[in-house]
A protein has these predicted regions:
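Charged, often glycine-rich, active-site loop that binds/positions anionic groups
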Residues: 177-190, 241, 388-396
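Non-catalytic terminal extensions that flank enzyme cores
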Residues: 1-135, 153-164, 168-170, 247-328, ...
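A broadly conserved sequence feature marking short terminus-proximal activation segments
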Residues: 200-268
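Acidic carboxylate-rich catalytic motifs and surrounding loops in phosphoryl-/glycosyl-chemistry enzymes
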Residues: 163-165, 171-175, 224-237, 374-380
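Active/ligand-binding-proximal structured segments within catalytic/core domains
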Residues: 136-147
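P-loop NTPase catalytic cores that bind/hydrolyze ATP
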Residues: 344-356
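A charged helix-plus-loop insertion that forms the helical arch/lid used to bind
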Residues: 182-204
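Active-site rim elements
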Residues: 229, 335-343
Length: 463
């Protein structure tokens, strides 16, 4: 301990001497605060002191010049000036595709006027309600409401006769996520109870989500509705989709769940008070009409695809759920669906887990021909190392200590954001994302740092 104290004292003294030299006019070495070399000495001394203040749990100083850059390339180049226009054209082209399909069996030719979508538009996002929403989730929610408002306003501008166009936000909660304390292993097989199966678990953080969503809906003037996983699996197209998934499970299992080579479909045990589900679907048994699931305590239970109330109980892992949801959206001729999600789901993830299976589905069924999901990706919030900001339950203890020291606890939790900044904190995040939607090249940056948002929450505008 004395050695630690002496190291700390020496580092502090070095910094003090450097700072003192700033108070001496025309010091003999000629060093001034504008000298790069002197700046480097100051920064090095600051870091040296930080390293020994708490040597068992060090903090590191992140120095930067406060300048932000938006180099164009890829999406930021293609959508530099406008994102809403191309999105609306894509939705209108989907309607034209449907009309062409219908016209192929009739003598009526589709109208090829300036394309404007006429069907209602639903802007989607999802969240696991297993924590108070953190900064990344709040950014996705802001993006959803702001792009919905921009779509509505653009439609009002280009097609006044369609000013009653229905644009709505839909937030789906993944209430089938596991309650961590209810995950167990029996005979090498993992079982879980989900948030919808554990009494009171779902309500723990739901108030935070509802409060944030209510504010954003008011600010944007766009209504929102909330849904749960049973709503997805109650869609009338889902039994047919599940039948196709089961028929092609030999190929899909390795695509959607390569670790276990099994379709990650599950259903909670229906015995009162149990609710266990086999997490990875390794013990499932399939027929063309049903899925048999296994409970370690109560044995086999069956869901029939012909019974809608039973199908609504089905759960799926993220890739399988994404595929089923995308298929149901493509098959919906009455509405347009646009999804907003984090950019960690872009690229290879979608190519492997979504687009390859979709291509095979369209080829084998001739459904959804010429159509793909409409997905927009929100930039990630990343820490100093470039790792995305994550829920505290996925980060080791003390993983975000530096954020707490810097007063950035609010980035990890909406409840803490409210406690530290009140409504103004969310307002500043909203205003920042609003500037991205107004200048869409900013949406195509891979990420923004926690340090960047520290400035935003402090009321600083970066240049």
């Amino acid at each position: 301990m004395p050695a630690v104290h002496s190291h700390c004292e020496a580092a502090a003294q070095d910094l003090i001497e450097l700072v003192k030299s700033l108070t001496i006019p025309n010091n003999k070495d000629g060093a001034t605060s504008s000298d790069d070399g002197f700046e480097a000495q100051i920064l090095t001394a600051v870091q040296a002191l930080l390293s020994v203040v708490n040597p068992t749990d060090r903090l590191y100083a992140a120095f930067h010049d406060g300048k932000t850059h938006y180099p164009l390339g890829g999406g930021s180049y293609a959508f530099q000036k406008d994102l809403v226009g191309p999105l609306l054209r894509a939705l209108a082209q989907d309607e034209e595709t449907m009309k062409l399909r219908e016209a192929s069996s009739s003598s009526d030719a589709p109208s090829l006027e300036t394309p404007v979508p006429t069907c209602p538009i639903v802007i989607h996002a999802g969240a696991q309600p297993n924590n108070s929403p953190h900064l990344g989730t709040l950014i996705v929610f802001c993006y959803v409401f702001l792009i919905a408002r921009a779509v509505r306003d653009r439609l009002d501008a280009v097609a006044p006769s369609k000013s009653s166009q229905n644009v709505v936000v839909e937030i789906t909660f993944v209430d089938t996520a596991p309650v961590i304390t209810s995950v167990s292993e029996v005979g090498g097989i993992t079982y879980q109870r989900s948030y919808r199966e554990v009494a009171g678990a779902l309500s723990t953080y739901m108030g935070d989500y509802q409060d944030a969503l209510r504010r954003m809906s008011q600010w944007s003037g766009v209504p929102f509705q909330t849904r749960f996983q049973s709503d997805l699996f109650s869609h009338p197209a889902v039994p047919g989709i599940l039948a196709w998934v089961i028929e092609h499970r030999g190929r899909l299992a390795s695509q959607l769940s390569p670790k276990y080579n099994a379709l990650a479909l599950r259903a909670a045990c229906p015995v009162l008070g149990c609710g266990l589900a086999e997490k990875h679907g390794r013990l499932n048994e399939y027929t063309a009409e049903s899925i048999a699931f296994h409970c370690p305590h109560h044995g086999k239970h069956v869901i029939r695809l012909s019974e809608a109330s039973e199908v609504a109980r089905v759960e799926a892992n993220a890739p399988t759920r994404n595929l089923i949801r995308s298929m149901s959206h493509i098959l919906d001729d009455a509405k347009h669906h646009v999804r907003i999600t984090g950019s960690d789901y872009a690229g290879t993830y979608q190519e492997f887990f979504l687009y390859r299976p979709l291509a095979e589905w369209s080829r084998s069924t001739r459904l959804g021909s010429g159509r793909t999901p409409h997905i927009l990706y929100a930039p990630l919030v990343v820490d100093w190392s470039g790792a995305k900001l994550s829920k505290s339950l996925y980060v080791r203890d003390g993983g975000y200590r530096a954020m707490k020291v810097l007063g950035m606890d609010g980035a990890c939790s909406y409840a803490k954001l409210q406690a530290e900044h009140g409504e103004e904190g969310l307002r500043r995040i909203w205003a920042e994302v609003e500037s991205w939607v107004s200048n869409p090249h900013k949406l195509f940056r891979a990420s923004y740092s926690v340090e960047y948002f520290r400035g935003i929450l402090e009321g600083n505008a970066w240049h």
